[in-house]
Amino acid sequence: MRIEAISRGAKKIFLIEKNIKVFRSLKSNLELIGSTKVELVNEDSIKYLKKLEHDAFDYIFLDPPFNQEILPLVLNLLSERKLIHSNSQIYIESEFQITEEFLGNNCDYECTIDKEKKSGNVYFCLITLGLI
């Protein structure tokens, strides 16, 4: 889905992957398609977001490892570091259902859950951010 965004007009994509095996697989696939619009980073996402200097993103895909409580940290970092803006959209996969209460506790923006589903043990949703 993230790489597919290139074919749908995304100007640039950042992929942050800590697992070296997954990183190498992604790198190999990106080399096959020859995309120069993807920045692939092999690092812990929390550490990377803490130092990232970038304008706010329009679209963000979050698929953190389950049972590690990373999602609240990432959402807070995105808000604090101004890496999101009103009208940003965030796609989230998690082991628990994302609620507006959860989002309100972990994001400085008004959040609207546009779509949500469950497949097996995975919940996923698309949210749109509103004004702070």
Model-predicted regions and their roles:
Residues M1-I132:
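Class I S-adenosyl-L-methionine-dependent methyltransferase catalytic core
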